[in-house]
């Protein structure tokens, strides 16, 4: 099992436009009416009053402005998994990074994902993954079974460089490429995920239900989040280290990778969110603990 705190995102460049089409850029010298929508920096706001001359506050709802979220270019770096950055054919981003070894993409709609690491403008590492996959167990399934595209892809064991540049390319030629979240950082080994007791992965549906007068049920605002429970074996000498780490990052969402081998296709045990419970019976040499992770919406 690996845990990866999210590094600060510093975007150098991207093919995704900085400004969203059809949304006015905020002008501090202009007066806005109720319902006017503007964008400023990487945020979108809606005016909540007439004769509005107040300035919107970055990433916050105020008495004058309702914060609607990030612009398209920055949605894949916000605090939600339910929003996505989309662009025709491909998404290309370049980031300033330091000493990272793990990169993970969530909510992908893509055929391929490519990463490149540059040090002093020289390409020092690259890798590419196809997202298309098919599960077949017999000849009949081979001929008729539809394929699918992976929505989660992660890269491990990336060589670390300080002052490097990371370039990612998310490609879906002829369609809209999309990604809901991108995380990169330095991983910490949390031990060996056990197959027995079995790990669990569940999806929780946060749906609002309202019963109408005619008896029909109206559902709105359906959002889901993932919950993962893992049983992990760890050297007892590292228990204090793990507990201290979790205490330090108790209020910070992190990337949790339950099974490191990408070839095993166990992305259902990969989540980005917060640990909820950490139970650690301590043994003499080895300790087995259980950790419960709740993904963000």
Segments and roles (model prediction):
Residues 1-10, 14-15, 70-85, 101-110, ...:
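Extracellular/virion structural assembly segments
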Residues 83-97:
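Short beta-strands within extracellular/lumenal beta-sheet-rich domains
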Residues 46, 92-94, 231:
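Generic structural detector for well-ordered beta-strands
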Residues 29-30, 97, 109:
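Short beta->alpha connector loops
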Residues 33, 40, 97-100, 162:
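Short, well-ordered loop/turn elements at secondary-structure boundaries
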Residues 1-82:
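Tryptophan-rich substrate-binding surfaces of secreted polymer-degrading and adhesive proteins
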């Amino acid at each position: 099992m690996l845990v990866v705190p999210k590094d600060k995102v510093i975007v150098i460049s991207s093919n995704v436009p900085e400004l969203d089409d059809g949304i006015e850029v905020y002008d501090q010298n202009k007066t806005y009416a109720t319902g006017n929508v503007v964008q400023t920096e990487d945020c979108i706001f809606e005016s909540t009053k007439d004769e509005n001359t107040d300035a919107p506050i970055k990433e916050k709802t105020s008495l004058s402005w309702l914060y609607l979220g990030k612009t398209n270019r920055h949605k894949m770096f916000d605090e939600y998994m339910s929003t996505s950055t989309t662009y025709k054919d491909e998404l290309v981003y370049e980031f300033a990074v330091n000493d990272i070894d793990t990169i993970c993409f969530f909510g992908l709609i893509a055929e391929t994902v490519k990463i490149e690491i540059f040090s002093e403008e020289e390409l020092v590492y690259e890798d590419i993954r196809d997202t298309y996959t098919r599960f077949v167990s017999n000849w009949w399934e081979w001929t008729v079974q539809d394929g699918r595209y992976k929505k989660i892809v992660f890269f491990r064991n990336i060589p670390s460089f300080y002052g490097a540049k990371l370039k990612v390319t998310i490609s879906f030629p002829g369609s809209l490429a999309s990604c809901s979240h991108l995380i990169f950082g330095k991983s910490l080994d949390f031990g060996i995920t056990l197959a027995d007791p079995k790990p669990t992965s569940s999806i929780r549906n946060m749906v609002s239900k309202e019963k109408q007068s005619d008896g029909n049920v109206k559902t709105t605002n359906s959002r889901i989040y993932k919950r993962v429970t893992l049983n992990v074996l760890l050297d007892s000498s590292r228990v204090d280290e793990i507990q201290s780490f979790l205490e330090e990052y108790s209020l910070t969402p992190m990337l949790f990778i339950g099974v490191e081998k990408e070839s095993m296709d166990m992305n259902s045990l990969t989540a980005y969110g917060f640990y909820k419970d950490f139970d650690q019976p301590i043994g003499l040499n080895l300790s087995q603990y259980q950790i419960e992770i709740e993904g963000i919406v």
